[in-house]
Amino acid sequence: MDRLTLALLTFDVGVPASTPDAFADRVCAQVREAWDDGADLVVLPEFLWMGLEPFVAEEDKLRGVARLFWTDLWPRLAPRLAQADKGVVLGTVPFLGPDGLLRNRAPIWDGLAFRHQDKLHLTPWEAAFVGGDGVGLWSFRGVRCVVVICLDVEIPELASLLRGQGVELMLVPSATETLLGVERVGRCADARAVELGCHVGVCHLLGRTTSVLIDENVGRAAAFAPSQAAFRDEPRHLATPVCTEGDHALTVDVDLALLRRHRATPGETDPSKLPARPLRLLT
């Protein structure tokens, strides 16, 4: 696959829904609209499924959302989003594992194959969760992909782990309540595009709601490309305006042939091609 059309969607969690199924219908409609408009791969924001919280009667809202999504909605939702040659990163949702622990999990449909990615590094507000055990690399129609959830994109050790793994597309679902959070995610996503020589797509949660985690949200959709000669005449930074509400989309034509030609061309300063060196701290 030489080109991939990527749809990065914000999601306003404050838009009311009458039932859990109505909320899920809205999510599905956005994904299918993006597919119908030509997107191959769609990404939705972190914690968008916490929008189900108003339908949870039990005191522990996180576990309640986990049960509502995975037990009730997911068996009906999954078949609607399994489509050959199409993909979606369905935001994130609390997942209650057999060990009784909560994880912040991104459900991923890669054509007809299902996979997931758990968030690795947690904010102080995610004390009820445990971090995931590792990051998964996967291939979507021949494109080497990785999902890195919000704070994880800010961790340079993760970028070091991914060095040399052939990552072509990094996808970053995110949720933050401050402009500084938007800035941190954006600046670090841009850095990952340079360090790994790959394309990076980010999308944020928007809107206000009554929630233990996502009461206020701000953000945008953004895409970054490597700062290398092959991309000199290409847009290397695209973004929607920063917003506090509304559903917005950034559709990006990811030129993979250009990326692969760049990787095969020697003689240019490129941090993604430098081998890791053993270093020591001088004191």
Q: Where are the language model's segments positioned?
A:
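CN hydrolase (nitrilase-like) catalytic-core segments centered on the catalytic cysteine
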Residues: 69, 73-87, 154-246
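C-terminal functional modules
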Residues: 279-283
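Extreme N-terminal starter segment of soluble prokaryotic enzymes
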Residues: 1-8
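Short beta-strand scaffold segments in enzyme catalytic cores
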Residues: 90-92, 104-108, 136, 202, ...
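Active-site catalytic loop in hydrolytic enzyme cores
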Residues: 95-169, 178-191, 261, 267-268, ...
